[in-house]
Amino acid sequence: MAQNNEQQQQGQGLIEAGVLDDIINRLLEFRNARTVRQVQLSEAEIRSLCSASREIFLQQPNLLDLKPPIKICGDIHGQYGDLLRLFEYGGFPPEANYLFLGDYVDRGKQSLETICLLLAYKIKYPENFFLLRGNHECASINRIYGFYDECKRRFNVKLWKCFTECFNCLPVAALIDEKILCMHGGLSPVLTNLDQIRNLPRPTDVPDSGLLCDLLWSDPSREVKGWGMNDRGVSYTFGPDKVAEFLMQHDMDLVCRAHQVVEDGYEFFAERQLVTIFSAPNYCGEFDNAGAMMSVDESLMCSFQILKPTDRKPRFL
């Protein structure tokens, strides 16, 4: 307990416990409403969430060492109502431990509520709630795909810059019980030793190439043996052989990543040696995909909880 209190102090030195609880309560106010409304937080409150969480991210390693049981979630992309449904399903923190694999902002309507709730939980439960960086937690990307516009419309550009400083400190990978390696995108041709991840500098922007870029951008591909060109125009694709080779070299069981919409919310690759998890159902209102969350128990058994896409009213354009 002492360690937990100490950790909480570190983040909450910048934000009082009562204030933090009030922010969380306001963010959860509409959790049972049919439609999720905008939550009114002040600019000062949001800034304090950014700076307090930033401190915690930097105190914790870039490659997190986590213990099960834990629930792993993929892309959320501003679909705040669906984030609340995930918590309804899996248990609101601290009922369960969580690891999110990045891409909290952009595309969806409520990136601000989404990222604010996640940062607030990080500050309140620093040892039970974990957030990794996705390729959208990067200024050059979320400047274009919606988050910048949402910050500017609801607050100002200075607040968007405050989030950028926070995102530049997010950890980039997690290792569960030394057996399950988690990141947003995938493997990298330059990754031979996990210390390379531990030693990546922070704060940092996401470069156009190299290890950090690959961890956030690469994709598995059934069409490729070895490394291939990525249609995204960034990073690489990697074949099943590269997954098997990596796991064997590092005595691991599974690579767990997000970054791609998959129809059932989760999808295995390379004979179940890699899994993609995507947690935004009806992504952008354009896909008919389910969302999923992977539960890892103490014995590293993985099971999936599914958010069906059809819990929605039909959309008429």
From Swiss-Prot:
Gene3D superfamilies given in the database record: 3.60.21.10
Known catalytic reactions: O-phospho-L-seryl-[protein] + H2O = L-seryl-[protein] + phosphate; O-phospho-L-threonyl-[protein] + H2O = L-threonyl-[protein] + phosphate
Enzyme Commission numbers on file: 3.1.3.16
GO CC, one annotated term: nucleus
Positions contributing to Mn(2+) 1 binding: 75, 77, 103
Residues annotated as catalytic: 136 (proton donor)
Keywords per UniProt: Hydrolase, Manganese, Metal-binding, Protein phosphatase
Family matches, as Pfam families: Metallophos, STPPase_N
Xref: PROSITE patterns: SER_THR_PHOSPHATASE
UniProt cross-references to InterPro entries, sorted A to Z: Calcineurin-like_PHP_ApaH, Metallo-depent_PP-like, PP1_catalytic_subunit, Ser/Thr-sp_prot-phosphatase, STPPase_N
Binding-site residues, Mn(2+) 2: 103, 135, 184, 259
GO MF, one example: protein serine/threonine phosphatase activity
Cofactor(s) recorded in Swiss-Prot or TrEMBL: Mn(2+)
EC category: hydrolase
Co-factor: note: Binds 2 manganese ions per subunit.
Xref: PANTHER family: SERINE/THREONINE PROTEIN PHOSPHATASE, SERINE_THREONINE-PROTEIN PHOSPHATASE PP1 ISOZYME 1
Family statement drawn from the similarity comment of this UniProt entry: Belongs to the PPP phosphatase family. PP-1 subfamily.
Protein name: Serine/threonine-protein phosphatase PP1 isozyme 1
Organism, as annotated: Nicotiana tabacum (Common tobacco)
Gene this chain is encoded by: NPP1
